[in-house]
């Protein structure tokens, strides 16, 4: 069975999946990917959109396996029309994302990127001048929007550090209260028609911090930029953006109170190992005609 992992992986990862009979094709290799499409039966997908055009060019495709949980980068309707199964892997990256969320919170509170820049530029004492904006997590109220696997791991970490946790989900809590009364707000929601631009930073508590390791489209990015520039928000820790890859001249990147990462909260060696194992199990099940794990379409 022709299985292709569409991802810019390391040499070690390439060797690992080759040993399993899986071909690794870099997301940046558009020509190579197009050449593989006619023969692909199983596509392991990370972030490069699986469009209707991609699906149409893959006549043998039987399974699109999301490496991760969010399937907003897959044209699920096009796959469904072709009878192609779509599966995800909930939980394989939860600990990695929870830890990265905590890291971004602390980096915002301690202005970590600016401190590193000051030390490297031999401006040691200049960094001390930021002291009035340094803060601790203990004693703060942290609002979690969404309460799935990631926030359930994150909440006890925050409480162990002295934070008070409140949350909103589709079944519990009040959205406006959590958004408007939290000292820090962390996003843990899927991106869909109901959640797109759900979060307006202007409705957050003045001086609060926004952390997003879910999807960039959850936030009104223009409003976020305004809130960070005028001081309504103290800082933002962002692993995801409305447009990815992000332009180097994006105005958010020019702000000193933005801590950013290139959508890697999920990406650890442990996450990849768990994901490859689970994805291989679905390959086995597909070949054996057994029910697939975590099928969403």
Residue ranges and their predicted role:
Residues 147-148:
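Glycine-rich Rossmann-fold phosphate-binding loop(s) that bind the pyrophosphate
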Residues 6, 46, 67, 186-190, ...:
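Short, well-ordered coil/turn residues at beta-beta hairpins
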Residues 151-152:
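N-terminal Rossmann-fold NAD(P) dinucleotide-binding loop
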Residues 82-84, 90-141, 156:
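Phosphate-binding beta-alpha-beta segment of Rossmann-like dinucleotide-binding domains, i.e.
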Residues 159, 209-297:
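Rossmann-like dinucleotide-binding domain for NAD(H)/NADP(H)
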Residues 1-42, 287, 295:
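N-terminal glycine-/charge-rich "phosphate-binding" loop or analogous flexible N-terminal tail
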Residues 52-55, 164, 170-251:
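Rossmann-like adenosine-cofactor binding region
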Residues 28, 67-68, 84-95, 169, ...:
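Short beta->alpha connector loops at strand-helix junctions that form conserved
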């Amino acid at each position: 069975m022709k299985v292709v992992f569409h991802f810019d992986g390391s040499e070690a990862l390439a060797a690992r999946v080759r040993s399993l009979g899986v071909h690794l094709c870099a997301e940046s290799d558009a020509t190579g990917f197009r050449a593989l499409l006619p023969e692909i039966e199983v596509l392991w997908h990370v972030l490069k959109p699986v469009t209707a055009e991609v699906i149409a060019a893959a006549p043998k495709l039987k399974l699109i396996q999301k490496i991760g949980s969010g399937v907003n980068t897959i044209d699920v309707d096009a796959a469904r029309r072709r009878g192609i199964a779509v599966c995800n892997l909930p939980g394989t990256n939860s600990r990695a994302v929870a830890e990265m969320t905590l890291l971004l919170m602390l980096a915002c509170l301690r202005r970590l990127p600016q401190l590193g820049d000051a030390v490297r530029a031999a401006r040691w004492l200049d960094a001390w001048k930021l002291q009035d904006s340094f803060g601790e997590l203990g004693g703060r109220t942290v609002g979690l929007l969404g309460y799935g696997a990631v926030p359930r791991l994150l909440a006890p970490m925050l409480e162990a550090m002295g934070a008070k946790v409140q949350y909103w989900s589709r079944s519990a809590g009040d959205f406006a209260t959590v958004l408007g009364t939290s000292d820090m707000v962390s996003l843990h929601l899927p991106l869909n028609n109901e959640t797109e631009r759900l979060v307006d930073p202007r409705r957050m508590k003045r001086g609060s911090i926004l952390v997003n390791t879910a999807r960039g489209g959850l936030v009104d990015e223009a409003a976020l930029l305004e809130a960070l520039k005028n001081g309504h928000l103290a800082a933002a820790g962002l692993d995801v953006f409305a447009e990815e890859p992000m332009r180097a001249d994006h105005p958010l990147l020019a702000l000193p109170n933005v801590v950013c990462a290139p959508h890697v909260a999920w990406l650890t060696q442990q996450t990849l190992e768990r994901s490859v194992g689970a994805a291989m199990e679905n390959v086995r099940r597909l070949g054996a005609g057994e029910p697939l794990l975590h099928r969403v379409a």
